[in-house]
Amino acid sequence: MPYELYYWDGIQGRGEFIRLALEEAGAAYVDITRETGSGRGTSAMMRILKGADTSDTPFAPPFLKDGELLVSHVANILFYLGPKLGLVPENEGLRYAANGLQLTVTDFVCEVHDTHHPIATELYYEDQKEAAKARSTSFIEHRIPKYLGYFERNLANNPDGDRHSVGNGLSYVDLSLFQVIEGLRYAFPRATQLFARQYPLLVALHDRIRDRPNIARYLASPRRIPFNESGIFRHYPELDQDAA
């Protein structure tokens, strides 16, 4: 039975971190809101979100169904899928380390979102443009170096080598870092132009993942929705600036 992924149609968003893991593993899955028919489409997702409030009712997408089991939140979903897809070490301690790194990615992605919506999510970008400029300047000058510097050091200090974030094999954390680099380059092309020099291990990891057969096929397929100004990583030229 294929996994069922529930996320908003038309954007990569947070659902993309799940898709990359499923695509890399060659797992069978259905992107529910992109399908039509019974039990498909955005209406099917909303029925779950607006259904009876139980202990497993998600607050928001993405969420994943595996048979009768429902799992929500990106890091939680990947913590569940990792062992099943072979995208996390067998060592229990390293699995928790991977989860900690993924939760840090989650924190970073929230800060990315706040560059274009620093005041309120219910307001349009145009209604908070000046605040977004100030937030983006701080993000580029302080938050990108803080987060990417951390992930770069994590690679450098991995006792199993600097090709992977955790252990000696590909993990869902590596795939998520690929997505982070892709998204930052789209949103802030000027600010990221020196990434190869500033974060060589992260960029090398990104490039290796980009060239993996399953990922390369996915990126070239219509399943990979292009970045756009409705998602998390948005390109507004007025928010970008040259790298320091």
What are the roles of these predicted feature ranges?
Residues 222-244:
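Acidic/histidine-enriched, glycine/proline-rich intrinsically disordered or flexible terminal extensions
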Residues 216-217, 221:
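C-terminal anion-handling pockets and recognition modules
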Residues 93, 97-211, 244:
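GST-like fold's C-terminal all-alpha helical module
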Residues 1-135, 236-244:
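GST-like domain detector, emphasizing the conserved glutathione-binding G-site
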Residues 28, 58, 65, 81, ...:
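A generic, residue-level signal for flexible/boundary positions that often mark functional hotspots
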